[in-house]
């Protein structure tokens, strides 16, 4: 049984640094690369990173890397790997994905077939099974992925199962919701802290508000879901339970939060409430049905985060233009508030009425979007305290 694994956390383009910080916060050294964060760890690291990483897509084991310019090199390279340390007799091991980029080998179905054949042959040899008899595959599943970039093959096993953005709290979603891991990453990129008010004026199914409450309460995002590794015989149930129990103990149940989510659609507000209930944070968020232009607040030093409907999500261009203009008018008086708006509309700034202080390119799935960042005026600590005392 292996003691240490080469691991990667896959991540949407533009969010790698966020995941790198999360991995380091768990105590693992890492290297941040395009679309991935590399680190080493034991079985506990596999469990912890799946349970705790908010902004990653998946955690994968790198079984091996080798040059592969021909199918023979691919076969021999896959065959040479230590599959017996991962796959017990009876395991299901589909080659679930093959991706070839800038490589001599480019026929992905053939890459999958050759890789499968090599793993089968290795396991037949290790478990002393006759070559002519197919291996039974009726046990736990180990999804194998093959990536060939510039004639170098990387062979991986997915430990997560469904993508990590699936937290297990979403009862229903809106038309084109933001993914939970993207929302968590944007909150970490923003200047919001749990002691600041937070408003999402176009909250949809409530993702930003729910993820914010979970961050503030230090709730592990994977506590309410299961993972592929939980079925594997070399990951002990006792260790899984220990890590889950430890995570439950770390939840901050004392903190008081000021989070509000609004949406013009009453049905979405009800969905958001149900999602917050399922996530265990319904007491932390005030959801209400409201139009953007009706938003008013006397509070200071807050953060507005919005993923408003945009071109690809809403066919009504005139409606989008009007909404962005209203946002600009409503947000303008909130001088001490920072605003973060995620949209794919490249004309957003002109419709909103002011240039962003900073713009960050991200991908919501395959859709290129920009995070427009408007920073609020700095507030002295005593002013925030005064305002708090006035509220009490």
Where are these regions (language model features)?
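Non-catalytic nucleic-acid substrate-recognition regions in nucleic-acid-modifying enzymes
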Residues: 2-142, 391-392
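C-terminal catalytic and target-recognition region of SAM-dependent MTase-like enzymes
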Residues: 290-392
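Conserved S-adenosyl-L-methionine
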Residues: 178-296, 312-313, 317-319
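C-terminal edge-of-domain segments
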Residues: 144-160, 372
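SAM-dependent Rossmann-like transferase core, predominantly class I methyltransferases
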Residues: 155-189
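Flexible, glycine-/basic-rich loop-and-beta segments that form/coincide
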Residues: 48, 53, 162-167, 171, ...
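A short, flexible beta-alpha/helix-coil linker loop
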Residues: 100-103, 162-163, 309-313
């Amino acid at each position: 049984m292996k003691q240490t694994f080469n691991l990667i956390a896959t991540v949407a383009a533009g969010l790698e640094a966020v995941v790198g910080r999360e991995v380091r916060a768990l105590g693992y050294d890492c290297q941040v690369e395009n679309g991935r964060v590399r680190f080493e760890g034991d079985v506990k690291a596999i469990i912890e990173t799946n349970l705790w990483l908010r902004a990653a897509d998946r955690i994968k084991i790198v079984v091996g890397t080798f040059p592969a310019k021909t199918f023979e090199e691919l076969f021999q390279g896959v065959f040479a790997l230590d599959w017996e340390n991962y796959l017990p007799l009876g395991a299901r091991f589909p080659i679930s994905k093959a991706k070839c980029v800038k490589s001599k080998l480019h026929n992905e179905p053939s890459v999958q077939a050759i890789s499968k054949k090599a793993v089968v042959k290795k396991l037949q040899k290790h478990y002393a099974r006759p070559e002519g008899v197919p291996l039974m595959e009726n046990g736990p599943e180990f999804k194998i992925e093959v990536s060939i970039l510039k004639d170098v093959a990387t062979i991986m096993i997915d430990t997560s199962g469904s993508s990590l953005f699936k937290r297990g709290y979403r009862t229903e979603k809106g038309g084109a919701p933001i993914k939970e891991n993207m929302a968590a990453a944007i909150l970490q990129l923003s200047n919001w802290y749990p002691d600041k008010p937070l408003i999402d004026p176009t909250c949809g199914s409530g993702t930003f508000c729910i993820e914010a409450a979970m961050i503030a309460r230090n709730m592990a995002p994977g506590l309410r879901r299961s993972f592929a590794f939980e079925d594997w015989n070399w990951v002990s149930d006792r260790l899984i339970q220990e890590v889950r129990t430890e995570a439950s103990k770390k939840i901050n149940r004392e903190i008081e939060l000021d989070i509000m989510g609004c949406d013009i659609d009453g049905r979405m507000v009800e969905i958001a409430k149900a999602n917050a209930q399922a996530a265990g944070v319904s007491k932390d968020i005030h959801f209400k049905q409201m139009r953007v232009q009706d938003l008013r607040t006397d509070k200071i030093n807050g953060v507005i985060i919005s993923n408003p409907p945009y071109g690809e999500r809403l066919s009504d261009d005139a409606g989008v233009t009007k909404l962005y203009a209203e946002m600009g008018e409503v947000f303008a008086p909130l001088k001490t508030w920072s605003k973060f708006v995620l949209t794919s509309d490249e004309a957003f700034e002109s419709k909103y009425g002011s240039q962003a202080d900073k713009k960050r390119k991200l991908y919501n799935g395959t859709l290129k979007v920009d995070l427009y960042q408007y920073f609020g005026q700095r507030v002295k600590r005593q002013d925030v305290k005064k305002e708090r005392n006035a509220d009490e």
